């Protein structure tokens, strides 16, 4: 069983296309878990209009949680053997699920990180695939290497349930869920990179991820967080 986990917020422009690209690759036994973080647009109505029994909308939180801890709510309810992360605004390319599952079987990996095409809007309003994420951010192994410079992009990740059990609950004040899950995978030494683009990673004004919107923390924030991250990882998973 596959659990696709998605956090949404004001994603009406793209969420239907993304969900259709996902659902077409799943079996009847799989699930798509969605937690909305208080959207003020038609995101929830669009999701509900699909009327697909595999989609489960998690009851809302009484307050906004932000993308990291909203996703944690979804992950904590996942029932599948394999967990796939999905952003609300991307597009899964045909064959993504089958190729990732084949890689799991071939490598005995706990976590697969695959490549993606950047998907940008042209001046004429059409969308076009550009460079690959791995060209901009070449992936690398190692805990301290990934604390220094993160390889992991959540929407390009899938992992086994045993890794999810290690990653939850998220540490407090976690700025990036993908880096945390990736570090948990690096600790097991069972992370693998699949160098084939399997999604269109959409770039637009309202991206929540740092890779797309160029947000930068201060040097002090980075140092404090990196030290905290290593300490938590070692205490959680052992030396």
Regions found by a protein language model. Name each.
Residues 1-3, 31, 180:
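Cell-envelope/extracellular polymer assembly enzymes that use nucleotide-activated donors
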Residues 11-24:
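Short, well-formed alpha-helical segments that are part of the catalytic scaffolds
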Residues 21, 36-45:
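A conserved acidic beta->alpha catalytic loop
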Residues 29-38, 58-60:
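Short beta-strand/loop segment that forms part of the nucleotide-sugar
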Residues 60-78:
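Glycine-rich, basic loop-to-helix element that forms the pyrophosphate-binding segment
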Residues 83:
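Short aromatic/hydrophobic "clamp" motif used to bind/position activated sugar donors
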Residues 97-127:
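Conserved donor NDP-sugar-binding/catalytic core segment of glycosyltransferases
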Residues 138-212:
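Conserved nucleotide-sugar donor-binding catalytic segment
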């Amino acid at each position: 069983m596959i659990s696709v986990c998605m956090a949404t917020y004001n994603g009406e422009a793209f969420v239907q296309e993304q969900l259709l690209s996902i659902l077409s690759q799943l079996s009847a036994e799989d699930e798509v878990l969605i937690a909305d973080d208080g959207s003020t647009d038609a995101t929830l109505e669009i999701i509900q209009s699909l009327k697909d029994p595999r989609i489960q909308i998690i009851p809302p939180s009484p307050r906004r949680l932000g993308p990291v801890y909203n996703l944690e709510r979804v992950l904590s309810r996942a029932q599948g053997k394999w967990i796939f992360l999905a952003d609300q605004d991307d597009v899964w390319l045909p064959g993504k699920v089958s190729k990732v599952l084949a890689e799991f079987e071939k490598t005995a990996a706990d976590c697969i990180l695959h490549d993606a095409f950047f998907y940008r809007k042209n001046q004429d309003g059409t969308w076009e695939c550009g460079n690959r994420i791995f060209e901009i951010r070449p992936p690398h192994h190692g805990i301290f290497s990934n604390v220094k410079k993160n390889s992991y992009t959540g929407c390009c990740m899938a992992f086994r349930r045993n890794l999810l059990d290690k990653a939850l609950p998220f540490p407090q004040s976690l700025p990036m869920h993908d880096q945390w899950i990736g570090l948990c995978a690096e600790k097991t030494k069972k992370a693998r990179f699949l160098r084939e683009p399997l999604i269109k990673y959409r770039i637009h004004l309202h991206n929540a991820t740092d890779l797309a919107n160029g947000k930068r923390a201060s040097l002090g924030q980075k140092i404090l967080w990196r030290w905290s991250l290593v300490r938590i990882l070692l205490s959680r998973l052992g030396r």
